């Protein structure tokens, strides 16, 4: 291994149950990973109130400096964080799954929301469990390992839709046995890599980690260009809006530009639906209006939702595949910007299609005030964070009053290269949210 990672392994079983096969596997694998130089944490429920109190004291002590929880973890015995007590629930003659207390979920959310991890590796992430809660709150690359070949009626039948919605966040899935892979594929179709619960598991996991990490975008920009831009003034930019050249908007270009100037916007991206004429008209009037205009288009693909091309010059026809649309944006020297990626009220690419174009995505919209549910924006933040994608925001305004309700504060730029460098250090300014805009 040439690269060392920060990794949290999460088990749903109380850590005291070391006779449990999954816990035994986690203990052996994490010890090996730590010995190989990785920074490893184990998150587990516990029956010990003292262990839970000790872990929470450590989390509180590390607030503001959460790296303390990882530093020193690269040793033969990784740090174990007891995230809370599990409550055994009995129901007549049948034993029901352990209940997950609110305190456990909050502790996991706090920990994973503040500590920087490369991977969250969840074992048996069925609901309700600590593993499932970790998957819900993770902002890292996620691996799900499935060990048992026993049918779980609660997760596969009663709570299937709920469980499946979070399994979409898994970037890789492994199964310990062929029977396990077959069972999981039956209920939750996907590719399951075989990783047996034996001495070679840690090496196989490392290979998966390296493969997934290679898909992340580079954090490094252009230092010389960054230094050049740092001397430029900060401007507010709205990256998503419409004019009356869109079928569902009645805002004239002149009104759009006047309102943008009045709202203090230094630059705007005009992104009409399947049309570029409004953006070209706006750019022609930009100097007089005192607002810089990025020519864009929000293109409806055949079956994979919408994607925005920024800094383009020619209209891209609707109805192409997602890959064809992206290729056309790139042919024009433009930038691929993914709007409202997880808003199920819009036509959006699903997780699988986003991964297929990941290498060509330049930026992703993480805040859109017109989404119906705020969790859609949260999901976009997670996706951008895990793959290190530059984050953007825009009002998606269809009426002039909505302009600037979401904006980016960034150093002034000329052209796509300077724009991307400036975007790396930009600040997202979130305003009011409304479906009316």
Q: What spans do the regions from the language model cover?
A:
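Nucleotide-activated donor-dependent transferases that construct or modify glycoconjugates
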Residues: 2-19
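A conserved catalytic-core segment of Leloir-type glycosyltransferases
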Residues: 2-4, 32-119
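Short amphipathic alpha-helix
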Residues: 21-33, 205
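Short His-centered aromatic/hydrophobic patch
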Residues: 101, 122-127
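Active-site proximal beta-strand in glycosyltransferases
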Residues: 119-121, 132-152, 167, 174
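Membrane-proximal helix-turn-helix segments that form the acceptor-binding/catalytic region
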Residues: 150, 156-173, 187
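Helix-loop-beta element that forms the nucleotide-linked donor phosphate-binding surface
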Residues: 181-197, 203-209
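Charged catalytic cores and adjacent phosphate/nucleic-acid-binding surfaces used
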Residues: 214-239, 243, 247, 253, ...
């Amino acid at each position: 291994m040439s690269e060392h990672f920060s990794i949290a392994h999460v088990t749903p079983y109380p850590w005291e149950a070391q006779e449990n096969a999954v816990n035994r596997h986690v203990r052996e694998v994490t010890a090996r990973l730590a010995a190989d130089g990785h920074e490893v944490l184990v998150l587990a429920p516990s029956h010990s109130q003292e262990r839970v109190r000790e872990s929470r004291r450590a989390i509180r002590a590390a607030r503001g400096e959460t790296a303390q929880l990882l530093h020193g973890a690269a040793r033969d015995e990784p740090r174990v964080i007891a995230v809370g007590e599990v409550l055994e629930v009995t129901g007549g003659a049948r034993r029901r799954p352990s209940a997950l207390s609110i305190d456990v979920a909050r502790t996991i959310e706090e920990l994973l929301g503040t500590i920087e991890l490369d991977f969250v590796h969840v074992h048996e992430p069925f609901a309700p469990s600590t593993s499932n809660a970790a998957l819900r709150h993770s902002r890292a690359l996620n691996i799900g390992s499935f060990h048992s070949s026993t049918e779980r009626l609660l997760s596969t039948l009663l709570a299937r839709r709920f469980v499946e919605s979070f399994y979409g966040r898994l970037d890789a899935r492994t199964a310990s046995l062929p029977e396990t892979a077959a069972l999981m594929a039956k209920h939750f179709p996907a590719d399951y890599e075989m990783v047996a619960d034996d001495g070679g598991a840690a090496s196989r996991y490392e290979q998966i980690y390296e493969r997934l990490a290679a898909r992340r975008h580079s954090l490094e920009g252009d230092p010389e260009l960054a230094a050049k831009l740092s001397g430029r003034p900060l401007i507010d930019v709205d990256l998503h809006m419409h004019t009356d050249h869109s079928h569902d908007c009645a805002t004239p270009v002149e009104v759009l530009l006047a309102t943008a100037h009045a709202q203090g916007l230094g630059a705007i991206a005009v992104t009409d639906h399947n049309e570029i004429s409004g953006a070209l008209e706006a750019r022609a009037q930009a100097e007089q209006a005192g607002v810089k205009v990025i020519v864009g288009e929000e293109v409806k693909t055949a079956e994979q939702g919408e994607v925005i091309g920024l800094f383009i010059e020619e209209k891209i026809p609707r109805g192409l595949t997602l890959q064809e649309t992206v290729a056309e944006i790139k042919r024009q020297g433009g930038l691929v910007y993914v709007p409202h990626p997880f808003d199920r009220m819009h036509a959006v690419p699903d997780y699988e299609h986003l991964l297929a174009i990941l290498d060509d995505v330049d930026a992703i919209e993480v805040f859109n005030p017109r989404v119906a549910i705020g969790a859609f924006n949260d999901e976009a933040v997670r996706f951008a964070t895990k793959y290190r994608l530059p984050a953007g925001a825009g009002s998606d305004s269809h009426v002039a009053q909505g302009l600037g309700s979401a904006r980016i504060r960034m150093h002034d730029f000329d052209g796509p290269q300077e724009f991307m460098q400036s975007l790396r250090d930009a600040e997202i300014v979130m305003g009011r949210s409304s479906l009316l805009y």
